[in-house]
A protein has these predicted regions:
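Charge-rich (acidic/polar
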Residues: 7-109
Length: 109
C-alpha cells in the first residue's frame, strides 16, 4: 500500500511540475522596463501575452504527445504578434528573454 501511495504522490508531483513549467505569467512592469515599452505597447503586449499564457497552459494540460506541437504553435503565434508590436531592438530582447525562459523550464524546441 505504501508503494502505491508513493507512486501516486510522485505522479501528482510530476503533474504539478509539468503544469508549472507551462505557466508563463510575467511581471509586466519589469518586462516594460526591460523592453522600454510605451503605454500603448504595454497594453498590446499584455493582451498578446495573456493569449500566449492560455495557449501554453492548454499545452501543459494536453497529452504528452500533443504538447510539443502545441508549444510550437503558441510560440510562433506569440512571436508573430510581438514582432508587429515591438521595435526590432525590443523584439530581439524579447526573443532572448523568451528563449531563456523556455530553456530554463525544459521546454526547448
Amino acid at each position: 500500500l505504501s508503494m502505491t501511495m508513493t507512486f501516486a504522490e510522485n505522479e501528482e508531483l510530476n503533474t504539478t511540475n509539468t503544469a508549472n513549467a507551462y505557466k508563463m505569467t510575467v511581471n509586466y512592469s519589469r518586462l516594460a522596463d526591460a523592453l522600454c515599452l510605451s503605454i500603448d505597447q504595454l497594453e498590446a503586449v499584455q493582451d498578446i501575452h495573456s493569449e500566449f499564457c492560455a495557449d501554453m497552459m492548454n499545452a501543459g494540460n494536453a497529452n504528452a504527445d500533443e504538447r510539443k506541437p502545441m508549444v510550437e504553435k503558441a510560440l510562433q503565434k506569440d512571436l508573430k504578434h510581438m514582432r508587429y508590436v515591438l521595435t526590432e531592438n525590443q523584439y530581439r530582447k524579447y526573443l532572448m528573454l523568451l528563449n531563456v525562459t523556455i530553456s530554463n523550464r525544459g521546454l526547448e524546441k
